[in-house]
C-alpha cells in the first residue's frame, strides 16, 4: 500500500512499505504517523490513500 500525504504549501509526501494488513487507515494515520485525523481529509483508493490538510 502507498500513502500519499498532500499539504497545501509543501510537495506531496509519499510513505511507502505500509503493511497490507492495515485494517483501519484512520488509526494508522493517527497512531503510527502522528497526524490528527480531525485535521485531515483523506480518501482511500486501491492500495493508495490520499491525505490533505484541512
Which stretches of residues belong to each language-model region?
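Short, mixed-charge low-complexity intrinsically disordered segments
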Residues: 30-54
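N-terminal acidic leader/helix
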Residues: 1-31
Amino acid at each position: 500500500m502507498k500513502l500519499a500525504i498532500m499539504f497545501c504549501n509543501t510537495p506531496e509526501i509519499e510513505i511507502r512499505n505500509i503493511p497490507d494488513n492495515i485494517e483501519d487507515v484512520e488509526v494508522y494515520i493517527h497512531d503510527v504517523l502522528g497526524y490528527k485525523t480531525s485535521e485531515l481529509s483523506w480518501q482511500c483508493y486501491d492500495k493508495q490513500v490520499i491525505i490533505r490538510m484541512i
